Amino acid sequence: MVDIILASKSKVRKEILERNGISITVEPSSVDEDIIKKALLKNKATPEIISKNLAEIKANKISLKKTNNLVLGADSVIDLNGELISKPKNRDDALKILKKLNGKKHYLISSVCISKGGFMIWNYTDKAILTMKDLTDKELEIYLAKITDEALYAYNVYQIEGEGRNLFSKIEGDENTIMGLPIKKIKEYLNSHK
């Protein structure tokens, strides 16, 4: 399979790609996501549009420097009734987010973009629907105490392939999408463009 640059520092995305036989080099794109999100929200962009735009901006930024390579950018956001929920900045923020999601259904949206020479050549967005159990504050605090800082910031508050699975009464959708990378569609694209 083709070598690709992953424009992300996400260890989980790297592991998903490698586990699926995709040879990658990691080169995180240092874009200021908060500024981009604020600008898009000001223009009334949906969480899905924000996710798509961030994935594309990340991929394009690196592909402008590495013009002969395919560059994969990715982004995941939570959509709670149209409200964009971003990654927590610290554990207190994570607890606030979990309390907001507590007992409710939300969408986890993951977008991927492949760029070459500064231009998007392919993109895909997938959604999963997650329904969180109605948990006590103490149960949420116990969950947060069990996970590492790295997991906390990398998984949109919950680590679905680990302890986070226990937070949910219902999970609909691809687990790889929830972990931030709809790998089946990426593989389909790469296999059809060898």
Question: Where are the predicted features?
Answer:
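GST superfamily/GST-like fold recognition
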Residues: M1-I22, K104, K127-K194
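Generic enzyme active-site microenvironment
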Residues: G73
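Amphipathic, non-transmembrane alpha-helical scaffold segments
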Residues: S51-K52, L98, N176-M179
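Short beta-strand-to-turn element immediately C-terminal to the catalytic PLP-Schiff-base lysine
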Residues: D79, C113-K116, K170
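N-terminal polybasic phosphate/anion-binding patch
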Residues: M1-L70, L84, K138, I142-A145, ...
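Short, solvent-exposed cationic patches
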Residues: L17, Y107-I114
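Active-site-adjacent loop/tail segments of enzyme domains
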Residues: S76-H106, M132-D134
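Anionic-ligand binding region
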Residues: S111-S115, F119-W122, K127
